Amino acid sequence: MTYKLKISYDGSFFRGYAKQKDENLITVQSELEKYLSLFFNTKISTFGSGRTDKYVHAIDQTVSFKCDSDYDPKSIQNFLNSKLTNIYVNSIEKVPNSFHARFSIKSKTYMYVINTGEFDVFKQRYEYQYNKSIDIKKCEDIINLFIGTKDFLSFSTSKLENTTRTIRWIRIIKKNKKIYIFINGEGFLRNMVRMIVGIILTYCENKITYQEVLDLFKNPKKGSAVIKVPGCGLYLYRTIY
């Protein structure tokens, strides 16, 4: 029996999504598996649509797991929500055994939130406190450089050999003093979204030229984009299957 979970979590309280070698570190995956194993009275291993780093949030993370037991999904959901802290299970359903949260996914959308107004002490764990104006039109000048299937080695600290990824679209929305950057793609490398946003902001500040951004793709070098915005403003916004 395969179950599919849709969850949200506040990344401020976790050392990322994935389990760590140090079992004392609390992660989203370790907490989920602890209480799923308690419910089913057997060890449960889960698979997420992707890993989020520490302080990164999720509005729509998808998780799957297999188990021999057949339970009403609602009873599992109610149990988990009664035990979990800073994680909420939005839904659980039974799915075909071929479903896998990581390998069945078609695309993911990330959202990055920036506060361009005055520093907000109550939102500092949920928005990047940039605290200065952003020229949206200038930001949009370089968006097309990221769209398509490209080698994003310069925008990642990943150890993977294959660093080619596909970005489908990027949208920037301004609401009052907040800037929301949405990035949709088929897959992402570690720190890729945060480094893309970092370069967009650096370009807006006139600290890097259009040609220099272009060169990050023409001559890719691991992590050469350098600028990485804080994890607190990043949300896994939507997972599509």
Curated annotation (Swiss-Prot):
* Catalytic center residues: D53 (nucleophile)
InterPro entries according to UniProt: PsdUridine_synth_cat_dom_sf, PsdUridine_synth_TruA, PsdUridine_synth_TruA_a/b_dom, PsdUridine_synth_TruA_C, TruA/RsuA/RluB/E/F_N
Q: Coiled-coil region(s) at which residues? A: none
Q: Name one GO molecular function term.
A: RNA binding
> Has keyword Amino-acid biosynthesis?
no
E.C. no: 5.4.99.12
Q: Where does substrate bind?
A: Y110
Q: Which reaction does it catalyse?
A: uridine(38/39/40) in tRNA = pseudouridine(38/39/40) in tRNA
EC class (word): isomerase
One Pfam family linked to the record: PseudoU_synth_1
**What interactions and quaternary structure are annotated?**
Homodimer.
Q: Which purpose does this protein serve, as stated in its record?
A: Formation of pseudouridine at positions 38, 39 and 40 in the anticodon stem and loop of transfer RNAs.
Query: Mind telling me what this protein is named?
Result: tRNA pseudouridine synthase A
Q: What species is this protein from?
A: Malacoplasma penetrans (strain HF-2) (Mycoplasma penetrans)
Taxonomic placement: Bacteria, Bacillati, Mycoplasmatota, Mycoplasmoidales, Mycoplasmoidaceae
Gene encoding the protein: truA
